[in-house]
Structure formats: structure tokens, C-alpha cells
Amino acid sequence: MSWKRNYFSGGRGSVQGMFAPRSSMSIAPSKGLSNEPGQNSCFLNSALQVLWHLDIFRRSFRQLTSHKCMGDSCIFCALKGIFKQFQCSSEKVLPSDTLRSALAKTFQDEQRFQLGIMDDAAECFENLLMRIHFHIADETKEDICTAPHCISHQKFAMTLFEQCVCTSCGATSDPLPFIQMVHYISTTSLCNQAICMLEKREKPSPGMFGELLQNASTMGDLRDCPSNCGERIRIRRVLMNAPQIITIGLVWDSDHSDLAEDVIHSLGTCLKLGDLFFRVTDDRAKQSELYLVGMICYYGKHYSTFFFQTKIRKWMYFDDAHVKEIGPKWKDVVTKCIKGHYQPLLLLYADPQGTPVSAQDLPPHAQLLSHTKTCYDSEDSGHLTDSECNQKHTTKKGPLVERRRGSGRIRRKADAPQASGYHSEGETLKEKQAPRNASKSSSTSRLKDFKETVSNMIHSRPSLASQTNAASPCVGRAGDQPDKIPARNLPLHSRGWETESTSSEARSSSSSKYRPTWRPKRESLNIDSIFSKDKRKHCGYTQLKTFPEDAAKEFAQDEVSNPVANDIKDGGPSSQHKLWGTARPGSHLLEQHPRLIQRMESGYESSERNSSSPVSLDAAPPECLNVYRDQSTKRAVGFVPSWRHIPKSHSSSILEVDSTAPVTGWTETQPFSDGEITSKSELDELQEEVARRAQEQELRKKREKELEAAKGFNPHPSRYMDLDELQNQGRSDGFERSLQEANSVFEESLHLEQEGDCAAALALCNEAISKLRLTLHDASSSTHSRALVDKKLQISIRKARSLQDRMQQQPPSQQPVQPSASLPSQGGGLPQPTSEQSVPLQVLLSQQTQLEPCKDSELGATSPFFHSPASCPEPHSSLVSPSPAQSVSQHSPPGTSALKLLKSFEVDIVNHSAFHRQDLPKATGRTEMNSQHECLPFDALEDRLQGHREDNSCCSKFPPQEGRDTTQDQLLEGRKTPVDISMGMPWSHSAGGATSERVMHSLNSPSSPSAQPAVPPYGACHPIMSAAASPVLHAADPMQKLNQHLQAQSLQTSLASKVVRGSEEPYRPEFPSTKGLVRSLAEQFQKIRNTSTRDVIGSQDRSLPNGLRKSSSPSDFMLPLSQGPEKEHCRWVNQPPSPDGRERQPCWEEPAGHPSVSIDSGLPNGEASRRRQPRLAEADIYQGKLPQVTDTRPTELGSSVSLGTSLPLDSWVNVTRLCDSQVKHRAPGLGVKSSSHDSRTCVTYPERNPILLHPHWNQDTEQETSELESLYQASLQASSHTGYSDWRSQDVAWQPLSLTGSADGMGRRLHSAPGLDLSKTPTAEMERILYEPSTVPVSQDSSNVRKKTLETGHHCSSSSSLPVIHDPPVFLLDPKLYPPQPQFLSPDVLMPSMAGEPYRSPGTSRSVQQFLAMCDRDETPQGVKYTGRTLNYRSLPHRSRTDASWGPGTETNQHIGARVLTAPACKPQLTYTATLPERHQGLQVPHAQSWGNLFHLPSHPSAVHPGSPPSSSLHVLHRSSWNSGSVLGSRTPGPRRIDVPPDDDGRQSQYPSQYRHRSAGEERVRFALSNTAGTEQSRVRLLQHSRW
């Protein structure tokens, strides 16, 4: 059917689709009623369509559940059934036979509405209303019915009284009360009055329409003066109630009247009750503005209906079974009527604010019907729809429409709500009479009232005002003659009403005399003659919008001001405008207050939704009304009826001729009544009132809209629209808020990008993308919103890609900085999904570069926090707490990078509850702040660590600035301190978060402050520090070395004293919880970045006395590895962190000389304190904990390894870069520290147990430390790219990276013989652990080293973990805690993906170790379960870098590796070996070369190594490789998926090549790793080369 197409063309969708949400209601608008040949039911079908689409009636009727049933003749039951079908039936054409039959039976005695006989639609409509009254309130007479639930009387009935007031003598006739359902007006009178009004007014106005109707209804109805003074008085009608639906019946003289076109053009879409009647007593009625929503037309003895569906805001044409969509504007209806020669017979004006009869007022039965009502489309004014929606569930789509309507209706609700009982006619009449008793005064006052109304309408609706002015002659007469003329007009009106109404006994009695004349005429109407002209259709339709169009654009503007009025005005004023000229539209608008118009249009043709209205009906009417009035007044002056310019029917031409007469304007009409001035004042008052009402209406509208939104009321299309609107509105707040949040996050990301923190920017960008995706889902109902969000989403995605590319393309140093930033967020986010983690990783890489020189200091305090999140979940708090101290001692330069790392890391940390993400979020958002704590003095750091330890959750709580200052100072003093810290921390890096944790423990403990600086490097911080300090270290290698050495000594002393004091232990417990997460991520990143550094540190740990190593690596490492400060430690050592700390303290004190030496030589004070903690750990090991550690290492070492692994995963990639930078930074001072520390780290970090299990490690460590230092120095000298003097010690420390190869093999041996398997010298063991994975063939390294790493708890190292490894940077030190995050990091940071995502066991820190192994892609230490080697690490070009950079260092590393491998006790450190080889890849090409597979495996072992030394090596290697390849992605095609196993074993082939590939500069770092000093320098140089 064409109407279907049209209807759906409106965008409503198919009829079924429309109805789908609310079956019948959605269907109703498009449903036709059958009219088979011979049935002649078109009149009934038209009446039914009107009733169904009248929202107010439908809703009210729906609520009626009980009635007086008449059986087969029960019209109520028949209506209910049809309405139900309208609502629920899927049929497009419904039968009306039941109702027709009931109607025929009901009126059988009267022989009306009989089957097969055509009858009058208006009368049918009226009689249906009366029958409804009878069924629901049959006891009450229709004339005095006050039943609150009587729809007919409460919503349709007009309670009127007629009175004649003599203007000369003042005599007043007795009021004649009566009730009418239909207000009949003669079309002839209407046209004549229109002509008169146009003659009197310069411009027609929308407000004139009501006046026109009033004048037409009373025209010729002149009565004799009650006192027989000889005056002829026009009768006056006073409206006593506030009907929400006004039905205007047009009585035609002929079936083929030539006035049809003029009448149509004269019709206004807005009707104000105050204008329609001489006076309105009900305040609601005074304010009420009704909008044309329905019209029954007649043509060729056939009735059809036009109705405005508020839901779709379009006029629909119902011709029995055919339903067509006419258009959104009244003009469209006018056009069709003119073309079809339709004669309007029944006009239905509804109050948009109308409400259904209240349920409480309804009889119990009445409520039954309510559901049917709900089904109605908001065809009627929408009053019912709103009310019904509010009372009941609004129709699915109804709510929105209802809201819209409601807002308009609300304004009218004051008017709309009929008095619960009509004002008693007697009282009203008396009240009215009193004024009218003085005929003149009464008429004057009435005229004033009328003027007020008209003027108000005029101001509100200029076109109507003009119309009113045009009709001013009549108005003037009306003013003075209301009493005289009313009699005739009234009879006509009554006549028409009675003619139609079969049951209008009272009415007929009052107006029966008029019935005969009009009824036959209507029946005989010749619509064809009427619709001969199309010209006026424009005006007629445009009352609301056409009027503005035709009458005046100003009026349109006014309409815009008064959306409601305007929309409705468009429909009505246009027609009026045409017939009336533009005046009618304006007058109509005036009649409708803008708010009313809005409501009407919403519910009707001109309802808010009416598309015809130029202005949104919802626009606030108050201002609009005043403006509109002013404009309308002005326009009225210059307004000429548009219909004049259009070919007109005969009557039209007459009107045009009359209109040619100068328009006097509204005031002209009023001169009769002394109301010109009064009317002006009244006008002002009216305007003010209108403005006030408009405001009130707006408020009501909003409230009602909300209610409607919640309920919905209109059927089919309307409800669809409403539903959509409701959806949008329902989610509008959430949607807007989400979009706003996404925008703010994206802006923050842009800001960070501008600052150079690409990693953090990427993390935020990814967050914005996720938010936008959610927002996009919320915006699904809005095309515009979806488009907007999609656009923003695409922009964000592009930005994220660009950031990734930028990070990958950045020099290793730069990328490490970004990874650092990413790592911090990643570290925080380790618990988060892998993808999230991978972002932080990238951030870390990018941060490292950015943070290399400056942010290290800033990040000094923050890096520990970052490390904590990066390293392990729980250690996070501890990590954070000691972080400041470590920052101070170790991460001065890395502070900046750590700062950024913390920024990104903090984001992740925020996501990690276990990691004290509370702190980390602070750090994440405030990476710089957090990183600042690194610089804190050891005492301050220790205090902070203690405080932080006290509140682990407040990782970021450490004065980042203070830490930053210290870090900055240290950076200023010498990046070597951060480097040394990184080197000293490499074990923390190597261990994933373990080393960091150890450092953090050291920080937590008295040595904690010194360890804390190293903590920043863990995961994110170290890489950052390396990145940041790398250049500086290069520049100030010797100086840094000295500074680091001095700092190491001072830190050693201070930390030793603090450890002795026992503060180490408290810090340690606190530290692990904080660093668990932060270090997990941070250290993983650092492991990647600081692979070299960590290897060096690992070597240093080995070179460090066993006590030192134990204290440093076991205590620091174990505690950091612990989920909590103590928990992590206990997991590692299977010992309370406190006992470990204490034991380590003694042990640390025992080898204090060595640690001090190593710290002095290679590590800053932070390194020294770390050493002390490792020594304490070693002491524990020596005391017999080493075997425990070996046993626990798979379990608890996993925790430590988890830190290491997590960091290697997260940090390794970053560590590769960070280590590169750290090697550079640390080269000066890390040598000694790193030697000793790395020895510790290698032993403790790869596998804490090996270190702890080696009771004789203190002595061996001292020896190995010396050897390793010499080896490292030789290596550093050999690979004097970096030219760091102190790299001799740092190289020794970094050799553990190369040493990782031997350390890997050694670690395996250690695993085999946990206690004594460790080499006598920690360096040997470290080398073994570090190199053994490297030494082991790739396969062996992959299987054994990773297995061991996995055993240690580092699944990420294993190939199986590779997918997890994808996001190694994200991995916490404890992968088990945050296994998914590495995956996240990989996506965010490509580099971390190379390192591989550590596969963390839920509760084992080995997972972290495994992660480390995967990160480094080196063979997993046999003792450690790093089976899941870094698939991504091989992606990371650690190998190439390692191979390239470790040429000179390889020999040293080989030597170290020989030692380590020689030392059977180092075998437990295979975890380190597994982990360190990854760093070795990045940093120890010589090791890999000398160790063969071990070195090739380094990248994998790095990923595999959970142990701190392997983790360190892994960190170095990963840092190098990631800096050059993974992180930078320059050599790597793209980010490696940690969660996906690499295509090939990168440890053997890919990673080495990648390393060679990636770092020319990273090779230096790897070289430095291979050669403790040379390797460190080499790695630093490599980092500088790759990054800078």
C-alpha cells in the first residue's frame, strides 16, 4: 500500500517493525479499517481512527476497565475490542463490524447508524462519546456529568453557558448552561468572519483563529436585550471547564461548497480556548492551547480522516483500509484536501499536555481499557498519551513522545485537567453573569477578556493576531456585540452539534433549532466545489509552519521561539494563513501558546515532533512567546494573507477582496470595546503570562518528558520514535559522560605525547579507545552519536597506531623511555589483561627514552612504584615503599624514565588491586611524581619505605618529588647511580620483579633505601632509568662509576646500618606488596631494558659475596617477589620476609665488605643496600635457606622470579632498552655493584633458592665478585663503547647477563644441586645461571632453562608462555599474579611482546621468572621453569644486539659463564641463567657466542629466566633487543604477540639476529653484559646508539 511506503518512508520502518516494539500501538498508526462494499462504514471508520489516535482518549479509554455492558449493543465493548486489535493485531486492516453492529443496535430505535446506511461522521463521533459516557457513568446525565473518569465529559465535553449582556442597558440574560461534545460552526459564517477580520487587521495572526471561530459561532446569533431595551445583543458563551480535546464541527451548506478551500486555509492548527469562547472561567482553560491533531473530511459522500501521529510527527490519511503518510506539515494536509476537494467536517484540537482520566477517577472497570488506550499512537494531541504513559507504562516508544508532549501538555495540564467536576454550571453562570449583569460592562469585560485572549494569541502567534486583526470588524462587533451576535452564531453552532449528536438531548434542547439547518448541509456537502483551488492549501496548512513560511518568516522565527506554538502553528496557521491569509497562522499560533503549540505538535500535527514546524516544539516558549507576540504583532501589521496571492475559490476571492481593505489591526477591532489600551495592557499581561506559562510549560515538559521517557505511550511509529528517543535520552547522560571521559583521556594522551611520553600516551590512548568502544555501543541507537563516536574512535586508533609506530621507531633509548612509561602503567596494569599490560610495556619503552636523562630524577621516587606494579602484584606496595630509597640510591637518572614509566605503569597499577594500584595509579597518572621518590636520600628513602611499607597500598605515597630530587641529584651526580642501581637492580630487573623486589626489600630494609633506587629500575623504572641515564652514563661513565661506587659505599654503610637496625625487614615486607605489581611490570620492562644492566648486576651479585648476594637477591628479591612485602618474600624463600631480611642482614653484614666493594665499584648506595639485602638473602641461603630457596625457588623463587619474570616480560623488553640505558647509566658505577650485586642477583634472582641455598655463597660471592669485577672490567674495557670506568664492577655485575649463559647452565646445576651446586663464587654461579641458559643450546635453553624458569614460577619464559610473553613489559615480577597483563603490554608496547609474556602461575613467583625467561628468549635455567620462553622476545632483536654487542664481552661472559657453570651451586641459579640469557641476547653476544646456544638462547632465556641474575641478563638483553627492535620495533616488523608463540625459536636464530639487527647500540649494552665492565659499557653504548 502506498501509505505503507509513505509511512515507512518517514523512517519509521515497516509497519510490523513499527509495531514490533508495542504490537498494536505500533501498528495502530498504519492500520486501516475495512469498509466492504455496501457497508458504508466510512463515517464510523473515520470516527474510530480519530478516537484511536487521540492520545488522551486512547490512554483514558485504556484505563477504563469496567462499564455498564449492553451486550451485543455495547459500544464500549466493541471499542475495547477494536482498540485491542489496533494495539495488538498484526493485521494492517481491521474490521469495524462489531462496533458498527453495536452502534446500529444502540441507535436502532432512532434509526441512525444502521448497517449499510451512510451516516454523519461527526455525529457518529459525538454519539460514540456519549455512549461511552453512558457505559461508564450512565447514572449521571450527560449535561451535568461530573464523573472524573468519564472520558467524554472530562476530556471532550465543553461545559458552557450562554448569556446575553446588553451593552446599552447592561441587562443580562439568565445563563443557559449546556454541555456540548462538538462545537459546531457554520462554514459560511467562518468564511465571512475571516473576511471581516482580515479587513480589520493588517496582518492575520495565529491567534486570530480562535477569535475567528468565536465570531463565526456567534455571528448572526443576535438576541433581544433581556430588558427589551431594543438592543440586539450577540450571545456570549462562557467556557466553564477545561476540555483537553475540542471538537469543532464545521457545518456546510452544501456537499459541494465552494468554500471548502477557504475553510481549509482558514483553519488554524492552534486553538486557544480563551479565543474560542467569550470567556473562560477555568484557569487551565485560559492557559490551554490545543493543537489540531485530527480532521474528518467529507467528499463524494465518503468520509476520510487526517490525523497527526505524534510519534512519527506526521500527518496520516486514513481512508478506510488505506493509510497514507501525508507529511509532517499541516500544509501537506491542506494541499491534499484542496486537491481532493475534501470538506473538513470535524476538527479535533487536543492539548499536548492533556492527560488521561486519572486511574483513581476511573471506575474499577475503566482501568481495563487503559491498556488499549496506551496502544494509541499519539495521534491525538498526545495529552492522553502523555497521561496514560505517565499513569501506566508508556508505550514502548510513547515515553519520548509523551515526554515531548508532556512538556507541552504540562503547560496545559493546568488548563487541560478538567475540573474533577465541571464547575457547576449554575455557579459558573452566576459568576459569569455577575460581570455580565452590567451588560455593557459585562460585554466590555468579556470583550476585554476576549481581547486579552486574542491579543495574547496574537502576540503569541502573529499570524493569528493578524487574522484576528483582519477579523477585527467582527471582533469589534464581537466585543460590543457578543451578546447580540452570539444568538445566531450559537444556534448555528448548536445546530451543527445537535445535528450530529443523537444523544444531545440537553444540547439539542439548547441548540436543537440549529441542528436541522447544518446537518443536512453537511451531508449534502459538495467537497469538490470547495476544493477547486489549491492555492490556499499553503496558507491553510501553514498555520504553524506555513504561516511563518507564507505569512512571515518572522512568524516562523517566532515559532522557532515558540517551538510548540510554531509547530502547531505551522499546521494550522498555514491554512488559516491561506484562507485568512497569513493572519490565520499567526492567530492560530497566538491561540496556541508556543508551549501549547509545542505540545500539540508533539502530540499532533504541530506537536513538538511535528517536522512541519520550523522550530522545535520543545523550544522554550516563554521567551519565544513574547518574541513571537512582538514579532507577530509587527508581522500582523505588515502581514498580508498569503492566500490572497493564491488562486482562491469564490469565497476566497471574496475574502481576498475584503482583505484588500486596509487591515486595521487588532487594536482596530478592539476600539469597539474600550479595550485598546486595556487590551494593550492586557496584552502585556497576557504576554507576561504567556512567557510565564511557557516557562512553566518548559519545566513541565521536561518533567513530563522524563516521565514519558520512562513510560512511553504512543503506538507504532510514535512509540518507535519515542523508544529511540528514550534510548538516546536514557543513555544520553551515560553516553555523553562516557564520551567526555574518553575525550579527556584522549586529550591527556595527546598531552603526554607532546611531552614525549609516547608509552604513557599510548596507554591512555588505548584506554580512550576502549571507552570509545563502549560509548559507541551506547550510541548505537543514534546515528549521529555513532558517527561522532566512531570518528573519535578512528582518530584514537590512528593515534594509538602512530604512537606504537613512533615508539617502535624511536631509538632504543627513546623507546625504553616510552616503555618505561608504558611499563609503569603496565606494571600497575599487570593484573590487567595482557593487552593492557602490553600498552604499559610500550609506554615503558617510550618512557625510557624520554625519561633517560631527566625523568629518571623525576621518576626516582616513582620508579619503585612502577617497578612494584611491574614486578609483582603484592610486592608493588613494598616496591613502592622502598622505591623512593632505591630511587635515591639507584635511580636518579632513571627517575625520569621511571617517572614516565610510572605514569603508564600507574595506570596499570590502578588496575592492580594486589599491586597497590592505588599507589601506582597515583604514580601512573603521576609517573613523574612517583619517579621522584627514587632520588630520596637513603635515610629519607628508608623512612619513606618504612612509611610506604606501612601503607603498601600507598606506593605513590612516597614523596615522589623528594625521591625525584634525590634521583635527580643522583642523576646529576652521575647517571651511573641509576645505572648502578639498575645494575644493582638488574637482578631485580633480571628477576622480573624479583630483583626489583629485592632491591625494594633492601629499600624496605635498612639497605632498602639503597635498594630502592634500584627498585625504580625494576620493570619499568630501571628501563627508564637506563634509558634516561644511559646517555648520561655514557657521558659520565667514569664519574658515574665513581659516584655510584661512592653512593654504593655510602648506601652500603647506611643500608648496612639500617639493615642491622632491622628496618630492612620491615621495608622488605612492605616492599614486596607494593613492588609485587609495580616491580613485576616495571622490572619486567627493566629486565627487557635493563637486561644488560641486570645481567651485569647479576654478575655483580655473583661477584658479590654470597652473603651480599643472598641479602641482596634473596632478601630484596624474595620479598619483592612476594605478593606482599612479606608474602612475596615468603613465596620466594618460603620464609617470612622478616626472617629472610634478618638473616640476610647478618649475611649481608658478613659480606658487607664485598657488597660494599661491589656496590662502591659498580653500584650506588642503593646498589650497595641492595647488595646488603642480597647478602642478607645469601646469608639466609648460607644459613641453610639456600636449599630451601632451591626448593622454594620453584615455588617462592617463582615469586621472586615472577618479579624477575614479570619484569623481564614487561621489563625485559623495556629492560632491553632500559638496560641499554642503564648499562650506560650504570656503566660508571654499576661495575662493582653489579658484579657483587649481580652475583647476588644471579644467584637470588634467577632462582632465589640457589642463592639462599648457597650457604658458602658469601665467600664465593666475594671471590666471584672480585673475579667478576675483573672480568666485567675487562669486558667493559673490551667493549669500552660506553667507556665506563666503573663498568669494570658494573660489567662484572652485568656479566651475569653474559654470565647468564653460564649461570643458566649453572642455574640448572644449581637446580640439580640446590645447595652446593652453586659455584663457590657468586660470580661463577651468576655466570652459570646467566650463561647456562645461553650455554645450553637453544633447544636446551628453551626446554631446560625455561622449564626451570617456569619451575621458578616463570611460565612466561616457556614457549607455552610465549603468548603471555607477548606482553612481557606488562608482566609483574610475579607473573602468576598478573599473567594476562604481559599480553596487554605487548599490544600496547610492541617491544614487550618480544620479551614474551611471562606465564605467571596464579600463586607462584616462578611465573614471573618464567616470564623473565620468555622475555629474554634465552633458555630457561634448568632450575627455573621458564618453559614459556618469550615468543615475543625472539621478536625482540636481543640476539642480534647481543651478538653484535657482545663481541668483546662474550669472552668475559664466557669466563664468567665458565665460573658460573663451574660452580655447581650456581645451578639453582639456572633461573637466572635462563632469565639472564635473554638479557644476554640483548647484551651478551660474547656470552652467547662463547656459550653457544646459551647465548643464542639468551633472548629466550631472558624470557624464561625468572631468576634475578638471568632476569638481569634478560633485562639487559631485552632492553637492548627491545630498544633496538622490539621496543623500537625498528628492526622488528611489529610488536610481537606475547600471547602467541613465535613462529620460530628466536633464542637460537631470530633473537640473535634480531639482536644483531636491533642494536648497534644495544650490542654495546649486551657486550657490557657479557663483559661485566666492558659489557656494561658496551650495552650502555648500544643503548645509547639504539636509543639515542
Swiss-Prot record:
The modification Phosphoserine is found at S424, S574, S613, S616, S1138. Zn(2+) 2 binds at H133, C145, C150, H153. It catalyses: Thiol-dependent hydrolysis of ester, thioester, amide, peptide and isopeptide bonds formed by the C-terminal Gly of ubiquitin (a 76-residue protein attached to proteins as an intracellular targeting signal). GO terms for biological process: protein deubiquitination; proteolysis. GO terms for molecular function: cysteine-type deubiquitinase activity; K63-linked deubiquitinase activity. Residues 380-391, 424-434, 1536-1547 have a biased composition (Basic and acidic residues). Residues 499-512, 601-616, 808-825 have a biased composition (Low complexity). Zn(2+) 3 binds at C166, C169, C225, C229. Keywords: Coiled coil, Hydrolase, Metal-binding, Methylation, Phosphoprotein, Protease, Thiol protease, Ubl conjugation pathway, Zinc. This is Ubiquitin carboxyl-terminal hydrolase 54. Zn(2+) 1 binds at H67, C69, C74, C77. It holds the Pfam family UCH. Residues 678-712 form a coiled coil.
